[in-house]
């Protein structure tokens, strides 16, 4: 090797090492591994007591998280679940779309339950896009037009807001805090665009502008450049936790399209929704419910339209936090979990709501997908038509038929309950680190 090459090589190594060592801490991520409602909020609440910053990276108030802290039940839609920890900073990242009236309504409701000093603990990205009331009107109209082929949207305006973002006529939080005349011009322009496409929507432009002028001073204390804030925090060794909204099977790219949400709720959305490079990611925690649920329409291979589905729905109190709709229920689906693990790269799993299975004499787990001709699939179907042509092959495991609700040590769980957990581990080749057997954070068992 020439002297010049050696110098260049050493220079590269030094630069590479410098970049690698630039961050003194890692970002840990909590992601839903199914169709949402897995209990991510409770997991984040448990982990938030040990971190400095908790972030939301995508979605809007179409997501719903319930956290029980000190006997009080908090419902969050836009706020990260970490806000219940008063020592923690909560960040709403650039990938989130924000309906300001809903955000402040959520703040007031949770302050009434005891949440305090949010102004000092909540940061909103200046690059996050705004959801307006007309986005919500459009969402409802588009859903109604689909008739019997509706997608089951929450009608919160999330899809139309992301559409505005993609077509480059959306408005960001930072623009609201700048020159209000420019904001007004942009608002009138986006309203006119939507009126041309949807003439029946009702928008009082002057009233809306007056309302948003009032929001300027209310939202200003929360807003800053979250990208710079997070990178500075990592360089200073601050611990960061990201709370994914929705779940992998609702991802716009990897979910059961078109029965999906409008954002990337897999690992990629964490990076783009917060402005983080891949090397900052540490643990990726997949949250898996011990059975499967889904809100709204769309394919659901292991769904049980029988007494088992009814029992899971009743015992699990499967009602959507955001929609208040009953969730569809079915058995655990291994092919689905293998697929989302492939996409997200889970380093460990938190298995939730194991106690809901306590009364069952036997428990089925979907282990293979087969076509109607008997051929086994080695992949998760990419189209709805392909997915509708599959049959599920089940493994039957013995139940434990005793309450696990008050157990706090993994080795004290009934043997068959432990075997259920180990079966999931062996199928996915991913360790189960925690098991949930109740509502509160104290009901999460550390397996190891």
From Swiss-Prot:
Q: Where is the active site?
A: 37, 65
**Keyword field:** Cytoplasm, GTP-binding, Ligase, Magnesium, Metal-binding, Nucleotide-binding, Purine biosynthesis
Q: What is its EC number?
A: 6.3.4.4
Supply one GO molecular-function term. Answer: magnesium ion binding
Q: How is the cofactor bound?
A: Binds 1 Mg(2+) ion per subunit.
Q: Which reaction(s) does the protein catalyse, per the Swiss-Prot or TrEMBL entry? A: IMP + L-aspartate + GTP = N(6)-(1,2-dicarboxyethyl)-AMP + GDP + phosphate + 2 H(+)
**Which residues bind GTP per the record?**
36-42, 64-66, 327, 353-355, 436-438
UniProt-listed GO biological process terms: 'de novo' AMP biosynthetic process; IMP metabolic process
Name the residues that bind substrate: 321-327
UniProt subcellular location = Cytoplasm
Transferase found in the keyword field: no
What the entry lists under InterPro entries is as follows: Adenylosuccin_syn_GTP-bd (IPR018220), Adenylosuccin_syn_Lys_AS (IPR033128), Adenylosuccinate_synth_dom1 (IPR042109), Adenylosuccinate_synth_dom2 (IPR042110), Adenylosuccinate_synth_dom3 (IPR042111), Adenylosuccinate_synthetase (IPR001114), P-loop_NTPase (IPR027417)
Kindly list the cofactors needed: Mg(2+)
**Binding positions for IMP per the UniProt entry:** 37-40, 62-65, 154, 168, 246, 261, 325
Q: Identify the GO cellular component terms for this protein.
A: cytoplasm
Q: In which pathway does it act?
A: Purine metabolism; AMP biosynthesis via de novo pathway; AMP from IMP: step 1/2
Q: Which Pfam families match?
A: Adenylsucc_synt
Binding annotation for Mg(2+): 37, 64
Q: Which CDD domains match?
A: AdSS
Q: Which family does it belong to?
A: Belongs to the adenylosuccinate synthetase family.
**What NCBIfam families is this protein classified in?**
PRK01117.1, purA
Quaternary organization: Homodimer.
What is the protein name for this chain? Adenylosuccinate synthetase
């Amino acid at each position: 090797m020439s002297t010049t090459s050696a110098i260049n090589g050493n220079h590269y190594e030094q630069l590479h090492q410098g970049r690698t060592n630039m961050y003194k801490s890692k970002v840990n991520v909590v992601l839903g591994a199914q169709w949402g409602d897995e209990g991510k909020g409770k997991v984040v609440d448990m982990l938030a007591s040990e971190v400095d910053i908790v972030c939301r990276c995508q979605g809007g108030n179409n997501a719903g998280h319930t956290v029980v802290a000190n006997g009080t039940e908090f419902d969050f839609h836009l706020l990260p679940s970490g806000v219940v920890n008063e020592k923690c900073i909560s960040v709403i990242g650039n990938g989130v779309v924000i309906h300001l009236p809903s955000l402040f309504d959520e703040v007031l409701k949770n302050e009434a339950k005891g949440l305090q000093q949010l102004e000092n603990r909540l940061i909103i990205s200046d690059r996050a896009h705004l959801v307006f009331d007309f986005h919500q009107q459009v969402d409802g109209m588009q859903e109604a037009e689909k008739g019997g082929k509706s997608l089951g949207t929450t009608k919160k305006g999330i899809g139309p807001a992301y559409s505005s973002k993609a077509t480059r006529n959306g408005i960001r939080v930072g623009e609201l805090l700048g020159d209000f005349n420019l904001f007004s011009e942009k608002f009138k322009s986006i309203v006119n665009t939507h009126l041309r496409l949807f003439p029946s929507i009702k928008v009082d432009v002057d009233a809306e502008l007056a309302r948003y002028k009032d929001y300027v001073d209310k939202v200003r204390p929360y807003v800053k450049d979250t990208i710079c804030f997070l990178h500075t925090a990592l360089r200073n060794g601050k611990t960061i936790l990201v709370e994914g909204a929705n779940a992998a099977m609702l991802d716009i790219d990897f979910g059961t399209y078109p029965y999906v949400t409008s954002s990337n709720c897999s690992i990629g959305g964490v990076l783009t929704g917060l402005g983080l490079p891949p090397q900052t990611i540490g643990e990726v925690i997949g949250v898996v419910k011990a059975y499967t649920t889904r809100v709204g329409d769309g394919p659901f291979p292991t769904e049980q339209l029988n007494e088992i589905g009814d029992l899971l729905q009743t015992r699990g109190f499967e009602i959507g936090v955001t929609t208040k709709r009953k969730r569809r229920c079915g058995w655990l689906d291994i092919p689905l979990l293998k697929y989302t693990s492939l996409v997200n790269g889970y380093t460990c799993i938190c298995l939730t709501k194991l106690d809901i299975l306590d009364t069952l004499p036997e428990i089925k787990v979907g282990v293979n997908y087969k076509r109607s001709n008997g051929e086994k699939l080695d992949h998760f179907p990419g189209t709805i038509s392909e997915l509708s042509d599959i049959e599920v092959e089940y493994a039957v495991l013995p139940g434990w038929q005793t309450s696990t609700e008050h157990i706090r040590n993994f080795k004290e769980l009934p043997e068959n309950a432990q075997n259920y957990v180990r079966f999931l581990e062996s199928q996915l080749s991913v360790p189960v680190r925690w098991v949930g057997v109740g509502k509160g954070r104290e009901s999460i068992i550390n397996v190891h």
